[in-house]
Amino acid sequence: MDDNKRPLYLPFAGPAILEAPLINKGSAFSEEERIFFNLEGLVPYAIETIEEQASRAYDQFRSFNNDLDKHIYLRNIQDTNETLFYRLVQNHISEMMPIIYTPTVGLACERFSKNYRRNRGLFISYPNKDRIDDILNNSTRQKVKIIVVTDGERILGLGDQGIGGMGIPIGKLSLYTSCGGISPAYTLPITLDVGTDNPQLLEDPMYMGWRHPRIGGEEYAEFIEAFMQAVHVRWPDTLIQFEDFAQKNAMPILERYKERYCCFNDDIQGTAAVTVGSLLAACKAAGTELNKQRVAFLGAGSAGCGIAEAIVAQMVSEGISDEQARSQVCMVDRWGLLLDNMPNLLPFQQKLAQKCADISHWNNFSDNISLLDVVNNAKPTVLIGVSGAPGLFTEEIVRAMHSHCPRPIIFPLSNPTSRVEATPKDILHWTSGQALVATGSPFEPVVVDGETYEIAQCNNSFIFPGIGLGVLASGARHVSDAMLMASSRALAECSPLAINGSGPLLPKLEDIHSVSKHIAFAVGKVAIEQGLSLPASDELLMQSIEDNFWKPEYRRYKRTSF
C-alpha cells in the first residue's frame, strides 16, 4: 500500500504540529484533524488543497523582484511546510531550480550569516570535536539515509565561505528530493566548521561560525576521521556525499573513505558522470564515438581531472588502451599544458600529464603551452572548461577549433554564470551554429541564422539524485566506479538530440523524475551484479525504486491517544 494512502499516527498536537515542517499542512488540515489535534483557530477557517496552497505560494514567489529574495522566500516555505515546498518546486522545476541551487545559492552562501533565519541541518565545529556523537544525536531526523557534507572551503567558484557553505548541502538535498524522490525525512545537511581563511568573514561582526583560521594537516584529518566514524555508528547505512571541499582535501578524502563507507564526491565523481553522459550523447548526435575524440581541458583541478579520468575509463571500455586514451586528453591549467617533466604536479595530475617526447614536434613548443597552442597542435574535437575563470574560451580559440572540427563539442562548465569560459551565444555564433554546447549553469536559448538552439545544462542534478535513489533502492554498500559509469550511460540514453536528432542535448528538467528512475535502475543493477547489495531481480529493483520515490502529497493524520 502507498505510504501516502496510509494514515500517519502522531503523538502530539497543537502548535507543535504547525512548527514541524515535515508534517505541517497549514490550511490543508481537514476538519477532523483540526479537532483531534487541537488546531481549531490556529489556522484560517477555509480548508485548502495542496494545489490551492501552491498557487498562492507561486503568486507570492513571483511578487519578488530579485532572485535572492525569491531564494529566501522558498527557504522560508521549506522551513515551515516541506511538502508544500516540494509540490511548488515540482510544479515549476525549470523556473525554481536556478533559485534554490545554482546560480542563486552562491549569493545565498555569501550572505548566509546576514540572512540567517532558522536552523536547518547540523553544524559540527572543531571546538566540539569530542562531542560529535552527541551532536549527531541532537538531529531531529532519526532515519537519515543521505547526508551532504561540506567544510565550506571551495563553494562553487566563490572560494572560502566558512559556515555560509551550508547553503550548498541544503540546496543539494533539496534536489535529491525534488529530482530524485528521496523523502526529505531521510536527508541531513551538515557543515563541518573548521574555521575560515576568508578575512572578510573573520572581521564580519555578523559571521556566525568559529572565528579562527582554518585548521589543516593532522588536526583536520583526525577531525574528518572522527566525523566519518561517528556517522557510521549513528547511521551505518547512510550515503555520504562530499561537497565543495578544497582541491587539496577533496581527492585525499575520497580515496581514504570510498572503500570504507558508502560515499562519493559530487564535485569529482558526479561532475565527471554527468559530463561523460553528456559527451556520450553529443558523440551519438554527431555520429561518432567517444574513443575517437581528442579532448582538451581548461582547468586541471580535482574536478577537471576527475572528469578526465572518467573519460579515459569510458574510452577504454570502448576498446582502446589506457595509454592511447590518455594521449588523447590534454589538461591545461594556469601554467599551461600539463607535462610529465613539470615539478610539483599533484598526484591526481601526474597520470594525465602529456609526455614531452610525444609533443616535441608541436609548433611553438615551449615550457608554457597555452590552450590556443593545444588547439592548433592537438586539434581537439572536445573542449571542456572547469577553470572558474570567465572568458578564456576566446573567439580565436573557438574558431581555430572549428576550422579542423565541423561539429566541435564545447562544454564551458564553470559556475556561476559570471565565471563561464564563454557564453553559448558566442560559441554558437563563432561556429555558425555547429557546436554542440552544454553549460554548467542555465542559459536562455540562442538564435543563430533564424534557428533556435536550446542550451543543455550539464548539471549534476541529472546524475546525483538518480545515484542516490539507486543506492537506496538496491541497498548498495559502496558507490563503485562501475556504478558511476552506468549512470553516465543511462543519462546518455535519455538525450532527446541523440534519440531524435533534434532538441536539446540533455533532457528537460520536467522529465527529471523519469531520468532519475532510469539512472537509479542502471546504478542499482550494477551494484547487484558487483555483489555490493543483496541479489534482486530487475522487477524487484524497479519496485524498490518506486517504493522509495517520495511524492509531495499530504498524508492523513491520526492521533495516537484517540
UniProtKB/Swiss-Prot annotation:
Keyword Oxidoreductase included in the entry's annotation: yes
Alphabetized GO MF terms: malate dehydrogenase (decarboxylating) (NAD+) activity; malic enzyme activity; metal ion binding; NAD binding; oxaloacetate decarboxylase activity
Gene3D superfamilies per UniProt: Malic enzyme, N-terminal domain (3.40.50.10380), NAD(P)-binding Rossmann-like Domain (3.40.50.720)
Keywords of this entry: Metal-binding, NAD, Oxidoreductase
Catalysed conversion reaction: (S)-malate + NAD(+) = pyruvate + CO2 + NADH; oxaloacetate + H(+) = pyruvate + CO2
Cofactor(s) the protein requires to work: Mg(2+); Mn(2+)
Binding site for a divalent metal cation: E243, D244, D267
Binding site for NAD(+): R154, D267, N415
Top-level EC class: oxidoreductase
Site (described: Important for activity): D267
Cofactor binding note of this UniProt entry: Divalent metal cations. Prefers magnesium or manganese.
CDD domains associated with the record: NAD_bind_1_malic_enz
SUPFAM superfamilies referenced in this protein's UniProt entry, alphabetically: Aminoacid dehydrogenase-like, N-terminal domain (SSF53223), NAD(P)-binding Rossmann-fold domains (SSF51735)
One GO BP annotation of this record: malate metabolic process
Any one GO CC term of the record: cytosol
InterPro entries from the UniProt entry: Aminoacid_DH-like_N_sf, Malic_enzyme_CS, Malic_N_dom, Malic_N_dom_sf, Malic_NAD-bd, Malic_OxRdtase, NAD(P)-bd_dom_sf, NAD_malic_enz_proteobac
Source species, domain of life: Bacteria
EC number(s) given by UniProt: 1.1.1.38
Protein name as catalogued: NAD-dependent malic enzyme
